[in-house]
């Protein structure tokens, strides 16, 4: 949408009369045109007055009667001028009233921006509070991250300790397995020795029985003519005693060796069992600590995720509020720009009307000088040599408005 305002200036080289044509000021234009016509009429009549004065002067040289007629004519013309001055003053008063009404109607209007101060202050306070909350949340997130890093370091150290303890437990299990295998071997050897002892006892009993049977048979059927020999029962008793002593000794040695081996293995098994129990207790304690650390780590991670979500929501809310505030600021700036444009247009219109008023006041002052008794002959002489020349200038002002904003303002003067 484009508005065009035309300003037409008409000037004379002598007394100047300005005619301005404005689309919104038809009454002012008509009054200004009336002032122009009055000025032109005044100049023409003053010129005719000058010519009449010249002719009157010539006639005064020729006769007194013509001078009296000339003075009468001048009095009539002066009365006509006074009537026109009165009508011009009346038109000037009307024009001033219209200018005043126009300025009151289209004067610069100022919007009251104080109503926006309170919501803007509240928004600034909310932005400040949200900034402080955001900084607090960031600090809490950093603290949570540091705590999570500390717990991660502790968890890694506990994990390494757990792995070392598990390695020790596996080594102890291997020792226990080796001990069990050795115990099984010893039990096998003990069983074999028991079987061997039983076999030896059985052989010994069989040999004793055989010897006894031989002794009994020999005592019944054998007749010895020779001298009596050694006592066989005594010999057999000695042999039996000797074999029983050897068997008892072997049995005692085997039992002592087995007892010593079993005592050693029992001590070693007890020691290994104690170590295994302590390792199990340590593993249980480590498992409990690891579980508590894992639970605490999960809680910290969940708190971190919740804080990050809160931070994202807060940043999104801040961004939306900032966009709203920026939109309000842009709207206010657009309104301010439009108000400034309206004020500039009104100032230009006011200057145009002020120029019209000044020109009219100049013409009124001229008429007042006539009324105050200024020498007409001097005025006629000063205006008799004036050549009236009219220069017409047209000023075209083009304003381009898009969405209530003045995009371009171009002024072109056409001669």
Curated annotation (Swiss-Prot):
Ranges for region Coil 1A: 67-102
Stretches assigned to the IF rod domain: 67-378
Other observations noted: There are two types of cytoskeletal and microfibrillar keratin: I (acidic; 40-55 kDa) and II (neutral to basic; 56-70 kDa).
GO MF term set: structural molecule activity
Chain positions covered by the region annotation Coil 2: 236-373
Region of interest (Disordered), residue spans: 1-25
Database matches in Pfam families: Filament
Tissues where the protein occurs: Expressed in stratified and complex epithelia such as epidermis, mouth and pharyngeal mucosa, mucosa of anterior esophagus, rectal mucosa and gland canals, gill mucosae, gill squamous epithelium and secondary lamellae, uterus mucosa, cornea, conjunctiva, outermost layer of Sclera and in olfactory epithelium. Also expressed in simple epithelia and epitheloid cells such as lateral line canal (mantle cells, neuromast), dura mater (meninges) and ampullae of Lorenzini.
Annotated segments matching region Linker 1: 103-119
Family: Belongs to the intermediate filament family.
Start and end residues of each stretch annotated as Coil 1B: 120-211
Quaternary structure and partners: Heterotetramer of two type I and two type II keratins. Keratin-18 associates with keratin-8.
The record's account of how the chain is modified after translation: Phosphorylated.
Location of region: Tail: 374-415
Domain of life: Eukaryota
Keywords: Coiled coil, Intermediate filament, Keratin, Phosphoprotein
Region described as Head: spans on this chain: 2-66
Organism this protein belongs to: Scyliorhinus stellaris
Biased composition annotated in UniProt, kind: Polar residues: 1-14
Region (Linker 12): 212-235
Protein name per Swiss-Prot or TrEMBL: Keratin, type I cytoskeletal 18
PANTHER family reported in the protein's UniProt record: INTERMEDIATE FILAMENT, KERATIN, TYPE I CYTOSKELETAL 18
Record-annotated site: Cleavage: 225-226
The UniProt record lists the keyword Transcription: no
């Amino acid at each position: 949408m484009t508005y065009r305002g035309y300003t037409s200036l008409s000037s004379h080289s002598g007394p100047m009369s300005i005619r301005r044509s404005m689309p919104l000021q038809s009454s002012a234009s008509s009054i200004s045109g009336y002032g122009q016509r009055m000025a032109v009429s005044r100049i023409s009549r003053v010129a005719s007055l000058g010519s009449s004065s010249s002719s009157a002067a010539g006639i005064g040289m020729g006769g007194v009667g013509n001078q009296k007629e000339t003075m009468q004519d001048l009095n009539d013309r002066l009365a006509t001028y006074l009537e026109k001055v009165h009508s011009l003053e009346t038109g000037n008063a009307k024009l001033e009233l219209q200018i005043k009404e126009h300025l009151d109607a289209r004067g610069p209007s100022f919007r009251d921006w104080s109503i926006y101060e309170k919501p803007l202050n509240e928004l600034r306070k909310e932005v400040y509070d949200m900034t402080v909350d955001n900084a607090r949340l960031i600090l809490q997130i950093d603290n949570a991250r540091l705590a999570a890093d500390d717990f991660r370091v502790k968890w890694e150290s506990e994990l390494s300790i757990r792995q070392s303890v598990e390695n020790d437990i596996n080594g102890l299990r291997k020792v226990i397995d080796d001990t069990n295998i050795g115990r099984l071997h010893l039990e096998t050897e003990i069983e074999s020795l028991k079987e061997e002892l039983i076999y030896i006892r059985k052989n010994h009993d069989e040999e004793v029985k055989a010897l006894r049977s031989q002794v009994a048979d020999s005592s019944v059927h054998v007749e010895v003519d020779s001298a009596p020999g050694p006592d066989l029962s005594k010999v057999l008793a000695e042999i039996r005693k000797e074999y029983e002593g050897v068997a008892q000794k072997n049995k005692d040695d085997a039992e002592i060796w087995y007892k010593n081996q079993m005592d050693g293995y029992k001590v070693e098994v007890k020691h290994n069992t104690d170590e295994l129990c302590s390792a199990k207790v340590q593993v249980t304690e480590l498992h409990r600590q690891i579980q508590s650390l894992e639970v605490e780590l999960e809680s910290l991670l969940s708190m971190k995720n919740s804080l990050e979500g809160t931070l994202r929501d807060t940043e999104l809310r801040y961004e939306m509020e900032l966009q709203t505030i920026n939109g309000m600021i842009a709207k206010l700036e657009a309104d301010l720009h439009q108000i400034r444009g309206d004020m500039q247009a009104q100032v230009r219109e006011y200057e145009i009307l002020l120029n019209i008023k000044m020109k009219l006041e100049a013409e009124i002052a001229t008429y007042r000088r006539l009324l105050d008794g200024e020498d007409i002959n001097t005025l006629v002489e000063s205006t008799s040599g004036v050549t009236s020349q009219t220069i017409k200038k047209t000023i075209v002002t083009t304003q381009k408005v898009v969405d209530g904003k003045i995009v371009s303002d171009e002024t072109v003067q056409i001669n």
